């Protein structure tokens, strides 16, 4: 919806929620209560998604099978544990628009980044640089720096960082592509976030991949803030690999299992160096316990150990909702909700805050990052105390995300009312 279609009254927000058929999915989640007992305004799904109401039953089923079957739950449970991760394969493939053989749920995000870099960061004397965002999430920075050091190089000379122009908060697409063209022959790996965690900027993954491949670079994305937020097309965009967590927009719960995408062109490249574990071994001979590792084809060949059933059960509850809603429809609702929140903030015409997230819908997801004058974190603290949940990133950024699965237009309205009151 264009901003001209919005208005600033609460009745408008209530009417929009009533007319929107996608609003029904809100009822599938537990909304934490505010201090006064009403439903909180939960705009922090970019940090931790809400709990689907079916999670408890899904967890209890696995606990019951463990209680009554013991080890036989691997084979005789309602959902046998041996192939349990494959209950999520088709859903994950649909979510990121990939072939089922290209995706797997395993480990956690930073672990998966390391496993992928073992295979796909192969530095040479001439081509040893890794390109990341200067404002990448710290864990990504730590992982990349440690990989560079592990290979005998120095981050001071082998780490390239993308930074905005002076006086700007986000990066211009043309600057990213120009840097890749200029430095590409020295870059071994491009590893960017699909969406920057601090600014909410979404990157043009298709064009970045095309530009990187033209220079001979491996191109990968940390999709922690993109999976379940944007409509991804990882296979079509020809991305080499990607990794993500599932506790943000995917609502898998705190510390939930992560996910990986490896393009099908690597499915049977068994000569690629990789760290190996028994769960990545050919399943037909896994229990023969032989000494030699024979990886499964596709992304499953990068698995190490059997994954946690309880975290996968929680994630399955959410992924079933994603399947029902459809990521395309959710993305359209997200564009409208975030646009409405942006409209309400703009109507304040205040010098006390500034939206630094790109204005173009195609250059952002659900998140808006608001720079608060003088780095006044107390504004965020008071909002949380009142039941308007958001979060703060130093030195001066308040992050809010009207997640389309469970946030409402009225949530956006109530947040802006409280935000302005606290600013004043």
Curated annotation (Swiss-Prot):
Modified residues (N6-(pyridoxal phosphate)lysine): 248
Keyword Hydrolase in annotation: yes
SUPFAM superfamilies xref list: PLP-dependent transferases
Coiled coil: none
GO MF annotation list: kynureninase activity; pyridoxal phosphate binding
Cofactor(s) in the UniProt record: pyridoxal 5'-phosphate
InterPro entries, A to Z: Kynureninase (IPR010111), PyrdxlP-dep_Trfase (IPR015424), PyrdxlP-dep_Trfase_major (IPR015421), PyrdxlP-dep_Trfase_small (IPR015422)
Pathway listed: Amino-acid degradation; L-kynurenine degradation; L-alanine and anthranilate from L-kynurenine: step 1/1; Cofactor biosynthesis; NAD(+) biosynthesis; quinolinate from L-kynurenine: step 2/3
Enzyme Commission code: 3.7.1.3
Residue positions binding pyridoxal 5'-phosphate: 109-110, 137-140, 222, 225, 247, 278, 306
Entries under Gene3D superfamilies matching the protein: Aspartate Aminotransferase, domain 1 (3.90.1150.10), Type I PLP-dependent aspartate aminotransferase-like (Major domain) (3.40.640.10)
UniProt-listed NCBIfam families: kynureninase
Role according to the record: Catalyzes the cleavage of L-kynurenine (L-Kyn) and L-3-hydroxykynurenine (L-3OHKyn) into anthranilic acid (AA) and 3-hydroxyanthranilic acid (3-OHAA), respectively.
Annotated PANTHER family: KYNURENINASE
Subunit structure, interactors included: Homodimer.
Protein name: Kynureninase
Organism (species): Koribacter versatilis (strain Ellin345)
Gene name tied to this protein: kynU
């Amino acid at each position: 919806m264009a901003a001209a279609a919005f208005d600033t009254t609460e009745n408008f927000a209530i009417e929009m929620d009533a007319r929107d058929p996608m609003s029904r999915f809100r009822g599938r989640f537990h909304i934490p209560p505010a201090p006064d007992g009403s439903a909180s305004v939960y705009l922090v799904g970019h940090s931790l998604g809400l709990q689907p109401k079916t999670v408890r039953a899904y967890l209890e089923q696995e606990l019951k099978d463990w209680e009554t079957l013991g080890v036989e739950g691997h084979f005789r449970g309602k959902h046998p544990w041996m192939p349990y991760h494959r209950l999520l394969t088709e859903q994950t493939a649909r979510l990121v628009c990939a072939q089922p053989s290209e995706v797997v749920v395993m480990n956690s995000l930073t672990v998966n980044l390391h496993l992928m870099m073992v295979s796909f960061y192969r530095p040479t004397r001439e081509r040893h640089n890794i390109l990341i965002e200067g404002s990448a999430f710290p864990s990504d920075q730590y992982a990349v720096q440690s990989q560079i050091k592990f290979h005998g190089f120095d981050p001071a000379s082998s780490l390239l960082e993308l930074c905005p122009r002076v006086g700007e908060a986000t990066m211009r697409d043309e600057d990213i592509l120009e840097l890749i063209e200029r430095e590409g022959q020295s870059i071994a790996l491009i590893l960017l976030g699909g969406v920057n965690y601090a600014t909410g900027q979404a990157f043009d993954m298709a064009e970045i991949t095309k530009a990187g491949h033209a220079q001979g670079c491996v191109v990968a994305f940390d999709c922690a803030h993109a999976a379940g937020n944007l409509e991804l097309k990882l296979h079509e965009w020809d991305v080499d690999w990607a990794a993500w967590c599932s506790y943000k927009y995917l609502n898998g719960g705190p510390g939930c299992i992560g996910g990986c995408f490896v393009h099908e062109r690597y499915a049977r490249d068994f000569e690629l160096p990789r760290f190996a574990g028994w769960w990545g071994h050919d399943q037909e001979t896994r229990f023969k316990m032989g000494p030699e590792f024979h990886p499964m084809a596709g992304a499953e060949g990068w698995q190490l150990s059997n994954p946690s059933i309880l975290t996968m059960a929680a994630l399955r509850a959410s992924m079933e909702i994603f399947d029902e809603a459809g990521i395309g429809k959710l993305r359209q609702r997200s564009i409208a909700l975030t646009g409405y929140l942006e409209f309400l903030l703009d109507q304040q015409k205040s010098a006390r805050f500034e939206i630094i997230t790109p204005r173009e819908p195609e250059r952002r997801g659900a998140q808006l990052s608001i720079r608060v004058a003088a780095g006044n974190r107390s504004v965020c603290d008071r909002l949380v105390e009142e039941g308007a949940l958001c979060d703060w990133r130093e030195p001066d950024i308040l992050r809010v995300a009207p997640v389309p699965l469970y946030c409402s237009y009225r949530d956006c309205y109530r947040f802006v009312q409280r935000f302005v009151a606290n600013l004043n």
